């Protein structure tokens, strides 16, 4: 309210109605408007269960329930905002679903570990921006969490062409970027991937892949 700004915040640990029976929280991304009103919330759908031998072990599903829906993009003064969280970044399906629903900006508040962040963070953010032709805004936790984990930091903004237009580093910091929707529409006009998508094929391939994985 004091600054008159929108805030994209996450992830918050939220107790849902199922807390008494599951004893698991939801990892929640909240969007507030300049009056402080809660405009939208998204519960993280992809949980980070990974094991990097000798480096990182995480099992988010041991204390977290997965969300069950993708939240429709929210209209803001700078464009239509899509909400995701951290590990969701590894799944292009959610960014493409948000783009299909009208998103112009994708937000990923995150806490990548140092091993995964140094290898994948920028690559994934640029990939999501290029394939969706959206701006990607990714806040990032930084610093030492405990003796076994350090967060990577490097909060970043990527434009629809895939260029990094603003970036922090490992320590606490703040960066700014202009959201130019005219430029976004130009990129989409010049490379019209939405018109070229073969949705008649993707469902068949996904079903075959799911059957093979099972």
Language-model region placement:
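Short beta-strand scaffold segments in enzyme catalytic cores
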Residues: 9-11, 28-31, 72-73, 155-157, ...
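Histidine-centered beta-alpha loop that forms part of the nucleotide-sugar donor binding/catalytic region
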Residues: 12, 43, 141
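CN hydrolase (nitrilase-like) catalytic-core segments centered on the catalytic cysteine
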Residues: 1-8, 80, 86-175
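Short helix-loop capping/hinge motifs at secondary-structure junctions, enriched
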Residues: 37-40, 163-165, 185
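C-terminal accessory region of radical SAM enzymes
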Residues: 180-182
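A structural signal for short hydrophobic beta-strand segments in well-ordered beta-sheet cores
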Residues: 13, 73-74, 129, 168
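A short C-terminal boundary segment appended to hydrolase-like catalytic domains
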Residues: 185-214
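Active-site catalytic loop in hydrolytic enzyme cores
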Residues: 15-101, 114-124, 190-193
């Amino acid at each position: 309210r004091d600054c008159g700004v929108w805030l994209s915040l996450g992830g918050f640990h939220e107790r849902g109605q199922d807390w008494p029976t599951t004893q698991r929280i939801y990892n929640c991304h909240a969007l507030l408007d300049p009056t402080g009103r809660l405009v939208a919330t998204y519960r993280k759908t992809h949980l980070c269960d990974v094991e990097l031998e000798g480096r990182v072990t995480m099992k988010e599903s041991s204390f977290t329930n997965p969300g069950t829906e993708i939240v429709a993009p929210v209209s803001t003064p700078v464009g239509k905002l899509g909400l995701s969280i951290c590990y969701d970044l590894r799944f292009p399906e959610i960014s493409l679903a948000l783009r299909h629903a009208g998103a112009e900006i994708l937000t990923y508040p995150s806490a990548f570990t140092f091993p995964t962040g140094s290898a994948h963070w920028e690559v994934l953010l640029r990939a999501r921006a290029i394939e969706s032709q959206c701006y990607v805004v990714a806040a990032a936790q930084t610093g030492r969490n405990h003796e076994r984990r350090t967060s990577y930091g490097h909060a970043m903004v990527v434009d629809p062409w895939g260029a990094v237009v603003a970036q922090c580093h490992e320590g606490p910091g703040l960066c700014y970027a202009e959201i130019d929707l005219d430029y976004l529409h130009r990129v989409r006009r010049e490379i019209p991937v939405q018109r070229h998508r073969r949705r008649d094929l993707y469902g068949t391939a996904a079903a075959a892949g799911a059957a093979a994985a099972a």
